[in-house]
């Protein structure tokens, strides 16, 4: 089920109108794209502020109810106050079920504790990336991509091309030939030398 949010349409624009909305605890925003016209909206600031703290809100299809009319959207941009805990503006993009969407989804790492490089060699896994941009139809959008680290050995590098993707999901960067590292297994300084010395002394 999509995450649901409620909004009101708004007719007043500009800095002054937006400031008055914020004083009232409302958050100005806009819905655009999907073949429709841009729709200025306002939302409850407190509700959106806490929703924005969750990864799933940033990487999921959202159902937004504007004056009783529901649309499916993606979160596209958030403008934060430079030093206050306040959202200044928020942008949503309409989606169409027959068109692919590009979304950054979180990477969910598993089995790091049983990786040979960790369990047997005392190494440490470093995550170069914690999210990745994917392309798919809205119906195929996953909440996250699972990254299995169970086979990582000392000094190994897990690349984007090593990720196991759900069906009908692509990584645009790979289509451009951009195969970036995702995780690396780093040995502690002097770890390998100590192991070799131990074997020799034995």
Curated annotation (Swiss-Prot):
Designated gene of the protein: rplY
Highest taxon in the source lineage: Bacteria
Function: This is one of the proteins that binds to the 5S RNA in the ribosome where it forms part of the central protuberance.
UniProt-listed CDD domains: Ribosomal_L25_TL5_CTC
One GO MF term attached to the UniProt entry: structural constituent of ribosome
Annotated family: Belongs to the bacterial ribosomal protein bL25 family. CTC subfamily.
A UniProt-annotated Pfam family: Ribosomal_TL5_C
Assembly description: Part of the 50S ribosomal subunit; part of the 5S rRNA/L5/L18/L25 subcomplex. Contacts the 5S rRNA. Binds to the 5S rRNA independently of L5 and L18.
Coiled coil: none
NCBIfam families for this protein: bL25_bact_ctc (TIGR00731), PRK05618.1-2 (NF004128), PRK05618.1-5 (NF004130), PRK05943.1 (NF004612)
Keywords, in A-Z order: Ribonucleoprotein, Ribosomal protein, RNA-binding, rRNA-binding
GO cellular component terms, A-Z: cytosolic large ribosomal subunit
Annotated InterPro entries: Rbsml_bL25/Gln-tRNA_synth_N, Ribosomal_bL25/Gln-tRNA_synth, Ribosomal_bL25_b-dom, Ribosomal_bL25_C, Ribosomal_bL25_long, Ribosomal_bL25_short, Ribosomal_L25_dom, Ribosomal_uL5_bac-type
GO BP term, pick one: translation
Name of the featured protein: Large ribosomal subunit protein bL25
Organism this protein belongs to: Nitrosomonas eutropha (strain DSM 101675 / C91 / Nm57)
Protein's UniProt keywords contain Ribonucleoprotein: yes
GTP-binding as UniProt keyword: no
């Amino acid at each position: 089920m999509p995450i649901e949010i409620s909004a009101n349409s708004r007719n007043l624009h500009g800095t002054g109108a937006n400031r008055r909305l914020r004083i009232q605890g409302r958050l100005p925003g806009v819905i655009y794209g999907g073949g429709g016209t841009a729709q200025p909206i306002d939302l409850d600031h407190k509700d959106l502020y806490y929703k924005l703290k969750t990864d799933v809100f940033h990487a999921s299809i959202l159902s937004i109810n504007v004056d009783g009319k529901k649309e499916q959207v993606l979160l596209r941009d958030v403008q934060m106050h430079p030093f206050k805990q306040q959202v200044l503006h928020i942008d949503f993009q309409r989606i169409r079920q027959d068109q692919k969407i590009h979304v950054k989804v979180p990477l969910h790492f598993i089995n790091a504790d049983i990786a040979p490089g960790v369990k047997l060699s005392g190494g440490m896994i470093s995550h170069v990336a914690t999210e990745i941009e994917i392309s798919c139809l809205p119906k195929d959008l996953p909440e996250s991509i699972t990254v299995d680290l169970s086979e990582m050995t000392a000094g190994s590098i897990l690349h984007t091309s090593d990720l196991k993707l759900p069906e009908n999901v692509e990584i645009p960067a790979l289509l451009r030939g951009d195969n970036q590292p995702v995780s690396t297994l780093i040995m502690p300084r002097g770890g390998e030398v100590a192991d070799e010395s131990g074997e020799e002394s034995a």
